[in-house]
Amino acid sequence: AILIPGTLGDNPIFQMMVEGAQEAAAELGVSEPKVVEGGDDYAGYEKLFLSLAESKSYDLLITYTDSMVESVLKIAAMYPEQKIQLLDGDIIGIGQEVPSNVYSCRFKNEDLGYLGGCFAGLLTKSDLPYANEDLKVGLIFTDIYPAWTNYIQPAFENGAKSIDPQIEVVF
């Protein structure tokens, strides 16, 4: 079963996650995964995930993002026989050990941020129309989110400053 912390339309990665799980199920000859969308009820995600574990109906529970780390840790401890996969959730980054029944992987957001910063630095130093002569670049996030502020933001700044240490990054 897959718990989407949001809705499928919120993030293209959610759709890719579901399609990947469906493809894997087809290749393995097992049932298609149940997909549960958490919607906008952020406080209810853990309860939904817990209900999936309590049902003991699924070999594997899958969820996504740093917003689910604490819930995954709690439910993994309550149901040590339940296999859980946490995509793009940083358990180690919050100083916790990954439980034996959890597979956790994190996207290398710092690489994305660094390359984005390099690109912004190259643009601002260029002679392209509207390039900022003041060597100033900006980074805009749609929300404050740990993977973004802990990894992308500092890496973006490092990438921009690798082009020119005088570049100012505005966040």
What are these regions (language model features)?
Residues 1-171:
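A residue-level marker of the well-folded mature domains of exported/periplasmic proteins
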